[in-house]
From Swiss-Prot:
Physiological role: Component of the class I major histocompatibility complex (MHC). Involved in the presentation of peptide antigens to the immune system.
Protein name (Swiss-Prot/TrEMBL): Beta-2-microglobulin
Species name: Cacajao melanocephalus (Black-headed uakari)
Assembly and oligomerization: Heterodimer of an alpha chain and a beta chain. Beta-2-microglobulin is the beta-chain of major histocompatibility complex class I molecules.
Family: Belongs to the beta-2-microglobulin family.
Length: 119
């Protein structure tokens, strides 16, 4: 019984230690297909390598939050960092600007990364 208690305490201590580690997310904004004006496409925001898991991600059109956005389930890598994919349908043109805004404990303020149609 004592051995079980010791093992349980070690597991709890190791898990609580993971919460102390913080890694800033890497943010990548890209379209599923090469951008063509007037042709429907998908805008993707891939956020990876972050810890802890609490994160807020918004896709933006001309600085305003896009409401109809879907996302993958929160997943983790071998190093226990997390990753997510947020995406929405959009139709590129020359007048609209698209971006991904991410809020995470490792950022002093939300970070916004613009979509570059040439990437």
């Amino acid at each position: 019984m004592a051995r079980l208690v010791v093992v349980a305490l070690l597991v709890l201590l190791s898990l609580s230690g993971l919460e102390a580690i913080q890694h800033a997310p890497k943010i990548q904004v890209y379209s599923r297909h090469p951008a063509e004006n007037g042709k429907p496409n998908f805008l993707n925001c891939y956020v990876s390598g972050f810890h802890p898991s609490d994160i807020e991600v918004d896709l933006l059109k001309n600085g305003k939050k896009i409401e109809k956005v879907e996302h993958s389930d929160l997943s983790f890598s071998k190093d226990w960092s997390f990753y997510l994919l947020y995406y929405t349908e959009f139709t590129p043109n020359d007048k609209d600007e698209y971006a991904c805004r991410v809020s995470h404990v490792t950022f002093p303020a939300p970070k916004t990364v613009k979509w570059d149609r040439n990437m």
